[in-house]
């Protein structure tokens, strides 16, 4: 181990980097291709619109090796 490796660490091998990128792409594809996801998003949007005056609604799906997540961000408007 060289002197600089102690401070900056070793660079990842290209195989490890490629493997990490592939895992990320596969996880994203898995999250996006859930068969019920589009209908679930539509239903969530309907419920949010029914009960709020949201200025912005954003729904994001994500997946990693252990868990699938659905993140909903709602910006509520001021009450009139």
Curated annotation (Swiss-Prot):
A biological-process GO annotation: cell division
Keyword Cell cycle carried by entry: yes
Similarity comment text for this entry: Belongs to the MinE family.
Origin superkingdom: Bacteria
Gene: minE
Record's keyword terms, sorted: Cell cycle, Cell division
Family annotation (Pfam families): MinE
Name under which the protein is recorded: Cell division topological specificity factor
Function, as annotated: Prevents the cell division inhibition by proteins MinC and MinD at internal division sites while permitting inhibition at polar sites. This ensures cell division at the proper site by restricting the formation of a division septum at the midpoint of the long axis of the cell.
Record keyword Cell division present: yes
InterPro entries: MinE, MinE_sf
SUPFAM superfamilies in UniProt: Cell division protein MinE topological specificity domain
